[in-house]
């Protein structure tokens, strides 16, 4: 999906975006119903097959959840898609970490650029609060008790309709639910699939009609895995009888 988002020659319609989100949430709902957290959702880990069917991939950080008082590492999820509770060092968390990542992916589909590209954990939190507003204790009661909590300046945030200017009210409601600061009230995959956004028109585009990347398969592999490009260059160098240091 990352390649699709970055390909500016492709037009992503509201129906395309709805299809990608529908398949993402359906896959995530299945995982969560089977007590599994993905913990590394991002566009690069959402793969599309030749029929346009989206698959969740890379389960290297996946973990079962649901055991009472079970602690986990907070160093999960690629930073740009990491929920604020993880950035504050939470060791006990649930499906909310995946749902926050879904919100970041949805925002990236709409904007065609990463939504909150922080340079460090502190910068990531700053970008989140500058964009979405600094949460209060009323909005997120357990925030101050998290291991790595630090106090931030009170940012008012930017209204979502000013960020996603082409989004309708139903889509804005979904985005709002995905970006709730309190993970206990953040929308779940099952709840998201029942929102008006998915029942309202336009409907999702069938997989076979979704846009395809305009670049060759080998180029796609190199974009998603730099090691493939390095291997190709090394092979070409050997074939030409040259010595290269990679």
Residue ranges and their predicted role:
Residues 72-86:
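Conserved activation segment of eukaryotic-like protein kinases, specifically the C-terminal portion
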Residues 201-246:
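C-terminal intrinsically disordered, low-complexity extensions immediately downstream
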């Amino acid at each position: 999906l990352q390649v699709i988002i970055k390909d500016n020659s492709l037009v992503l319609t509201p129906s395309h975006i709805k299809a990608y989100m529908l398949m993402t949430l359906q896959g995530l709902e299945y995982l969560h119903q089977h007590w599994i957290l993905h913990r590394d959702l991002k566009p690069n880990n959402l793969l599309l097959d030749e029929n346009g069917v989206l698959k969740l991939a890379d389960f290297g950080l996946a973990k079962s959840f649901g055991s009472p008082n079970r602690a986990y590492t907070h160093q999960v999820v690629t930073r740009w898609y990491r929920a604020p509770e993880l950035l504050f060092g939470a060791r006990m968390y649930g499906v909310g970490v995946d749902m926050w990542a879904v919100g970041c992916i949805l925002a990236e589909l709409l904007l065609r650029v990463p939504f909150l590209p922080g340079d460090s954990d502190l910068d990531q939190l700053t970008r989140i609060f500058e964009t979405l507003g600094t949460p209060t204790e009323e909005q997120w009661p357990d925030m101050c008790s998290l291991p790595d909590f630090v106090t931030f300046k009170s940012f008012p945030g930017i209204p979502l309709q000013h960020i996603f200017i082409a989004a309708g009210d139903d889509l804005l409601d979904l985005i709002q639910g995905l970006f709730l600061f309190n993970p206990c009230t953040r929308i779940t995959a099952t709840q998201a699939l029942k929102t008006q956004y998915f029942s309202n028109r336009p409907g999702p585009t069938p997989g076979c009609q979704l846009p395809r990347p305009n670049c060759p398969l080998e180029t796609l592999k190199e974009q998603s895995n730099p090691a493939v490009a390095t291997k190709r260059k090394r092979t070409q160098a050997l074939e030409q009888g040259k010595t290269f240091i990679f």
